[in-house]
Amino acid sequence: MGRQKELMNRCGEMLHIRYRLLRQALAECLGTLILVMFGCGSVAQVVLSRGTHGGFLTINLAFGFAVTLGILVAGQVSGAHLNPAVTFAMCFLAREPWIKLPIYALAQTLGAFLGAGIVFGLYYDAIWAFANNELFVSGPNGTAGIFATYPSGHLDMVNGFFDQFIGTAALIVCVLAIVDPYNNPVPRGLEAFTVGLVVLVIGTSMGFNSGYAVNPARDFGPRLFTALAGWGSEVFTTGRHWWWVPIVSPLLGSIAGVFVYQLMIGCHLEQPPPSTEEENVKLAHMKHKEQI
């Protein structure tokens, strides 16, 4: 055991990446991969079973818990944004340097692409058998919707843009409230579960129109994968060239979310007064008694 542990420690030292931003990018990639793998995996199960193995609620539950797991995996390293819209909001608030935006976005999109690839491999035979060895983007035998979002037949472009805008703004407002130490901070370690709950609520209330992407990486990465995996360029033209809406609208919605939270909550929160020396002594004494 001793030699094995020593060998593992040496391997860890050799593989350790010293460039912090690269470590963070890898964490974002893996976290987003987990999000897409479990989230789109749940969609695949519902679609390919034609509703016998789940439904709309199970998809929303899966995406909510997938976000939670992705944050738990990557949070300590990168903050687990898992979404370019979240990274954009944090950079806009000067909580993150702007250099992180393109790097995080690329890593998140790559993670989503790889997550879609895993789902495709996992359900490879079922996908091909679903429509007699053909791949359709839309229609009763469409399977591209397993991976990326597409608008419902009733939805026009303006309403769809507003749908993604509001969904992302709501997400950002809630995320900012969760991570704001001067609001009602979530107990440490529960942030991931709370953000997952936010995604679940957005899905169950705003998912009907187009599947609530509210995440450019989660939508574009898998969409690009489907284009390369056999569905072709139709994934970009279906829905009146819908593909750009889940990219542009969430980024604008994230800025709206920042303004709404800051103007109505963030700018008005009062910082707690600094503790006095006497209070610090009392706190230290209480901690000492608890240890005894």
Curated annotation (Swiss-Prot):
Top-level taxon of origin: Eukaryota
Transmembrane portions of the chain: 25-42, 57-74, 101-121, 160-177, 190-206, 243-264
Glycosylation sites: 141
Catalytic activity: glycerol(in) = glycerol(out); H2O(in) = H2O(out); urea(in) = urea(out); H2O2(out) = H2O2(in)
Motif segment (NPA 1): 83-85
Protein name, as recorded: Aquaporin-3
Tissue: Detected in principal cells in collecting ducts in kidney medulla (at protein level). Renal medulla and colon. Predominantly in the inner medulla. Expressed in basal layer of epidermal keratinocytes.
Domain remark in the UniProt entry: Aquaporins contain two tandem repeats each containing three membrane-spanning domains and a pore-forming loop with the signature motif Asn-Pro-Ala (NPA).
Short sequence motif named NPA 2, residue ranges: 215-217
Topology in membrane: Multi-pass membrane protein
Compartment list: Cell membrane; Basolateral cell membrane
A GO term, aspect molecular function: water channel activity
Keywords: Cell membrane, Glycoprotein, Membrane, Repeat, Transmembrane, Transmembrane helix, Transport
Function (record text): Aquaglyceroporins form homotetrameric transmembrane channels, with each monomer independently mediating glycerol and water transport across the plasma membrane along their osmotic gradient. Could also be permeable to urea. Also participates in cell permeability to H2O2 and H2O2-mediated signaling. In skin, transports glycerol to the epidermis and stratum corneum, where it maintains hydration, elasticity, and supports lipid biosynthesis for barrier repair. In kidney, contributes to the reabsorption of water, helping the body maintain proper fluid balance.
Main location: membrane
Gene designation: Aqp3
Listed GO biological process terms: cellular response to hypoxia; establishment of localization in cell; glycerol transmembrane transport; odontogenesis; positive regulation of immune system process; renal water absorption; response to ischemia; response to retinoic acid
Native species: Mus musculus (Mouse)
Site positions (Selectivity filter): 63, 212, 218
Disruption phenotype: AQP3 knockout mice have normal perinatal survival, growth, and serum chemistries but are polyuric because of defective urinary concentrating ability. Mice have dry skin with reduced SC (stratum corneum) hydration, decreased elasticity and impaired lipid biosynthesis. The glycerol content of SC and epidermis is reduced, whereas that of dermis and serum is normal.
Extracellular side: 43-56, 122-159, 207-210, 225-242
